[in-house]
Amino acid sequence: MEASASKLIVACAGNVVAVTRRDPELMDVLVACGCRVVINDHADQGMGTSIAAGVAVTPATGWVIALGDMPSIRVDTVLTIVEALRAGARIVVPTMDGKHGHPVGFSALYRARLQSLAGDTGAREILKTDTMFADEICVDDAGIFLDIDTPADLKVQH
């Protein structure tokens, strides 16, 4: 989580909200990285509630929805997503070899829909219904696919 948060802090000029369950040790790490921490007491109900909680506390003009278990995403990939949002993109999806990855950027047009998310599908439904508004950006970054779910996953990535 620390590696993911640190990269996002750099790419997003320090404007990072980390949404997590109530875990004092994790919260301390995130605050030390420079994140604003929001507690999601409904985290057990799925990723959608975490996205909704993070969007609700920010007056942002767009969001890069990133997962804490994807520390291999490069800073320049996140910067490219941020720049596309600033240039007027509605949704920005990084791709490599024709496959979609993470993180995904959403403009302020999606505030209400992001705030109403629930369940464990995250923003996937928005991507399905609004695919015609998604800008795909090609990146040379396999990190957009790599998540760490177990200690073995971490060993494979190193």
Where are the regions that the model predicts?
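Residues that form generic nucleotide/phosphate-binding pockets
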Residues: V29, A84, R113, L117, ...
